Regions:
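Short, well-ordered secondary-structure micro-motifs
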Residues: 2-9, 68, 99-101, 132-134, ...
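Conserved beta-sheet core of the metallophosphoesterase superfamily
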Residues: 193-244
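Generic detection of short hydrophobic beta-strand segments and adjacent strand-loop junctions
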Residues: 39-41, 151-153, 235, 240
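Membrane-embedded segments
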Residues: 46-144
Length: 244
């Protein structure tokens, strides 16, 4: 009977279709689940090291497009369970055409976030215009915008935000010039950065709104890409801990 089933073209095609649908559904379900990664950053050759600091990094949520405001509210609860010292939004929190109601709901959820050293954000390529337009409202939710700016936390950790886009975007070289090389630093980068520049500025960690890796020939390539949209990255959170 098994032989007859697989020997029948129509049934074989149907079986392949069912298996493909099941695999696709499993991948989609997994992509919507929030996953955590832990990274340890060693503060080498720093005259002013910081104490252990827990950081939650969130990017590519595309609220109003890939993620609903309700789903984001659930994400906030999971973040608060981690009890982070700092929360970083690395870009593309909103979609390109997120409406006002969804923006307000999202910001109301952000107000419930708890981070002793604050919440910081840089916009991504998708929401650069929206963030620039709504920056006062976003700041009112307790978010510190790093639009080609730097900030030094109370524990000495530097945060630098390099914008992805926007009419008033400054060159990355200018923003990186704000870094104090004696302090550990995390750069939220909206565009790819050469490895030699990272070494020159003694940057501890560079975070991108999409995972970008060096191809070895001076270029970059995206990883964890899913067709037609990078759904996996939209629900991705990286948990990092700074250590001496």
């Amino acid at each position: 009977k098994i032989y007859r089933f697989f020997n029948h073209p129509t049934k074989l095609i149907l079986g392949f279709f069912v298996v493909t649908m099941c695999v696709g559904a499993a991948i989609f379900w997994k992509s919507r689940c929030i996953s955590w990664e832990e990274t340890v950053i060693l503060q080498e050759n720093k005259k002013e090291p910081v104490k252990d600091t827990s950081i939650v990094y969130i990017s590519n949520c595309f609220v109003g497009s890939d993620m609903t405001a309700h789903a984001f509210d659930s994400l906030v609860e999971k973040v608060n369970e981690k009890k982070p010292d700092v929360i970083l939004f690395g870009g593309n929190l909103f979609g390109r055409h997120t409406n006002e109601v969804t923006i307000d709901k999202t910001l109301a959820s952000i107000k419930k976030m708890k981070a002793a050293l604050g919440i910081y954000m840089v916009e991504g390529s998708a929401d650069s215009a929206l963030v620039e337009e709504k920056k006062e409202k976003i700041s009112g939710a307790g978010v510190h915008l790093l639009l080609d700016e730097s900030a030094v936390l109370h524990n000495g950790l530097q945060l630098v935000g390099c914008r992805a886009d926007g009419k008033t975007k400054k060159p990355m070289s200018y923003t990186l010039s704000l870094i104090n090389k004696e302090k550990p630093s995390i750069v939220l980068a909206g565009e790819a950065m050469e490895e030699k520049l990272k070494e020159e500025k003694k940057i501890s960690l560079v975070l991108y709104p999409k995972k970008i890796t060096d191809t070895g020939n001076g270029g970059t390539s995206g990883v964890n890409q899913m067709f037609p949209r990078n759904v996996l990255a939209s629900a991705k959170i990286n948990f990092m801990q700074i250590k001496k």
